[in-house]
Structures are given as C-alpha cells and as structure tokens.
Amino acid sequence: MAKEYSRTQRIGDQMQRELAQLIRREVKDPRVGLVTITAVEVSRDVGHAKIFITVMGQDNAEDIAQSIKVLNAAAGFLRMQLAREMKLRSVPQLHFHYDESVVRGAHLSALIERAVAEDNQHVAAAEPEDTKE
C-alpha cells in the first residue's frame, strides 16, 4: 500500500525541487556557492516554510552565514517565482537555515572510524600474546 503524505509534505517536496532549480538559474550572487536544499518544512497553515540548505565548498561559518543572508534577502523574489511555478493560492514565506546534520553526520562517521581503527590496533596487539602461549 502506498504511503500517505500530508498536503504540507507534498508542498514541501515540490518546493524543494522548484527552489533548487530557481536558485541555480536565478540567483546570480557570487557569495552564494553551490547550494543543496536538504529539506523543506512547511507549517500546517502553509504560511511559513523552513528551507534547510548545505553549501558545497564553504566550510567556515562566515561564508555559510553570508550565503544564508543572501538567500534570505532573495526570499521575496524566490517566493514570487515559486508562485508562478507552483500555482498555489498562497505561497509560504521562505526562511533559509543551514542544515548542520550533514556536518554532524560526518563528525560521527569520523569518530566511528577512529574507534574501529583503535579497536583493530588493540586486537592486533593482543594477537601475538595469544600465539605465544
């Protein structure tokens, strides 16, 4: 049986696709790097939308904050373009946020790899002692 999605989830999914194309095509500001929209959360009343993004090639907080600032400044323009593309009665106000889950995931992955490497070293160090007995 197909999974049911709420109206706000369907709107969020469509907004994610449309915004990705609009940002790539229409936002020409050099301060905005390669933006990836990771998620869109639309409020129940469809009045506001949180757009979570990551920016490829920008690792320091200042560059990321600058990209967010530029996108929030362009939110009105992007909202107007979305209205043309999506044909909704009312298009939500756009609020861009940095998605830290990717950075957090990379950090956790590095911690796991380090723990596995240390465990392998302990196992390798313990093996010669076992073979001597």
Curated annotation (Swiss-Prot):
It is found in: Cytoplasm. The gene is rbfA. Transmembrane segments: none annotated. This is Ribosome-binding factor A. Monomer. Binds 30S ribosomal subunits, but not 50S ribosomal subunits or 70S ribosomes. InterPro entries: KH_dom-like_a/b, RbfA, RbfA_dom_sf, Ribosome-bd_factorA_CS. GO terms for molecular function: ribosomal small subunit binding. Belongs to the RbfA family. One of several proteins that assist in the late maturation steps of the functional core of the 30S ribosomal subunit. Associates with free 30S ribosomal subunits (but not with 30S subunits that are part of 70S ribosomes or polysomes). Required for efficient processing of 16S rRNA. May interact with the 5'-terminal helix region of 16S rRNA. Pfam families: RBFA. It comes from Pseudomonas fluorescens (strain Pf0-1). The keyword Cytoplasm applies. The keyword Cytoplasm applies. GO terms for cellular component: cytosol. NCBIfam families: rbfA. Keywords: Cytoplasm, Ribosome biogenesis. One of its GO terms (biological process) is maturation of SSU-rRNA.
